[in-house]
Amino acid sequence: SLLTPYGLPAQSGGRNIQNGLGGGVEPEALKQGTPDPADFDVYWKKQLEALAAVPPKLLEKKLVKESNQCFVYDVKISCVGKRPVSGYLSIPKGAGPKSLPLRVWYEGYGVSSAPIRENPAEISFSVNAHGIENGRELAYYKELEQGELHNYGLRAAGNQKPESSYFNNMILRDLRALEFARSLPEWDGSTL
C-alpha cells in the first residue's frame, strides 16, 4: 500500500491505494548469484535440437471471438513434451501481410486459461504457460491445480535432472510460441 508521510496507508474513497513499482540503483552492476553449470550451453543446444526435431505444426486454430476490431483464435501448436503450445491469438481485422507489430504475452505460472487480449494496432499472442486448454470452466483448472499440476515446479523427483524439470518443457513451449508467432504473415518482420 502507498503510505502517507506519517506511515499510514493512503486511502481514496475509504480504500487503500495500491500500486506496483520497481526500481534499481546501478542495475548493470548486478552480478549472477551462482555460475552456470559447466554443461549449460551443451544442454540447451541439445534441447533446442529436440525442439527443432518436432516440426512447428498448427494443430488447432479455432475462432472463439470476433469483435469490431479483431479476430481471436484459440490455437495449439506442436511442441516437444506431452503438451502443445496453447494460447489465444488476436489478429486485427483487415490486417495485411507484414503490416503489424507483434506482442507475445507469457502469462505467468498460474493454472488457468490464458487471457484474451485484443489490440487493433498489433498482433497479440497470449501463451498459456502449461499448454493446457483455454477458456474452460473453473473446475477444470481446479482439478489440474489440485492434481496433475499440484506443486508442479517443486517436486524433488522432477528436479533431479534438468531434462525432467517441469520448467524445461515450459521454456521450450515458450520458444515454440515465439517461433510460431514470428511466422505469421501479418507480422511486420521487425517489431516485437
For the regions a protein language model found, what residue spans apply to each?
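Alpha/beta-hydrolase fold active-site loops
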Residues: 101, 122, 191
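Alpha/beta-hydrolase fold nucleophile elbow
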Residues: 185-192
